[in-house]
Amino acid sequence: MTIIIDGKKIANDLCERLSQKIDILKREYNIFPCLKVILVGSNPASQVYVRNKQKKAESIGISSETIVLPDNISEDELIEKINELNEDPSVHGILVQLPLPNHISASRVINTVSVEKDVDGFHDENVGKLVKGEKNCLIPCTPKGSLHLIKSIEENLSGKNAVVIGRSNIVGKPMFYLLLQENCTVTILHSQSKDLAEYCSKADIVVAAVGKPNFVQADWIKKGAIVIDVGINSVNVGKLVGDVDFEGIKGKAKAMTPVPGGVGPMTIAFLMMNTVIAACLQKGVDASNFIS
């Protein structure tokens, strides 16, 4: 019988514990975590994501504000706004909601955000620290949340064969390095790779983040594998499905995540955690006491 990993419940439990730690930060350290989200334009999906982030932040005691800017804002004007937030000591986390309009360089914007306020974990310096295995860095939220879900099923991953399907800077590549740090043997694949079925059939862990509905087939999956579905695809007038054949794999995998209700809530939970880590880093407080 396949365990359907309830990401929503796990995320809520994490946020409940984090809320208690935030109370301690406020009471004993006079640290009031603050997150600023910049939304450029009026993309409906981005508006929903930002609203969910702000709602969760406020529910656990993180001060949060969304700064909405017009989609015709110049790159330099956006950079200027980010620098204002960088210089504000009361702001601990800065998130620029992606995607950005085509005339704005996402890379330049991401690397303008202060390394210690980069709660998305996308800044080149934080990426470099992740690659080197350093602990005092901010790690992208979706892979961090995905790893937590895997470890909710199996704590010791040492020696496991893991496959990551997808090579994005947001999920695939950081997921590769996180699994490597857990002493897994990791293979990274993508939509153009050959012999995906062969690689997946040997994997104890499969993380799918390729952005194609039902891309991962049931006959690719080894019996007893853990399958994490990061994909979220809209099909048939608003129905959401992931990157894996959920019904086909259910009953074969040891555990798997649903879409929705799997990885999505964990991304937001770890954004909250990164905001607390960022606040601790900036105030010289050991973050490990507040994120366990």
From Swiss-Prot:
Role of this protein: Catalyzes the oxidation of 5,10-methylenetetrahydrofolate to 5,10-methenyltetrahydrofolate and then the hydrolysis of 5,10-methenyltetrahydrofolate to 10-formyltetrahydrofolate.
GO molecular function, one term: methylenetetrahydrofolate dehydrogenase (NADP+) activity
Family: Belongs to the tetrahydrofolate dehydrogenase/cyclohydrolase family.
Record pathway: One-carbon metabolism; tetrahydrofolate interconversion
Top-level lineage group: Bacteria
Keyword Transferase: no
Protein name: Bifunctional protein FolD
Catalytic activity: (6R)-5,10-methylene-5,6,7,8-tetrahydrofolate + NADP(+) = (6R)-5,10-methenyltetrahydrofolate + NADPH; (6R)-5,10-methenyltetrahydrofolate + H2O = (6R)-10-formyltetrahydrofolate + H(+)
Residues engaged in binding NADP(+): 166-168, 191, 232
HAMAP family: THF_DHG_CYH
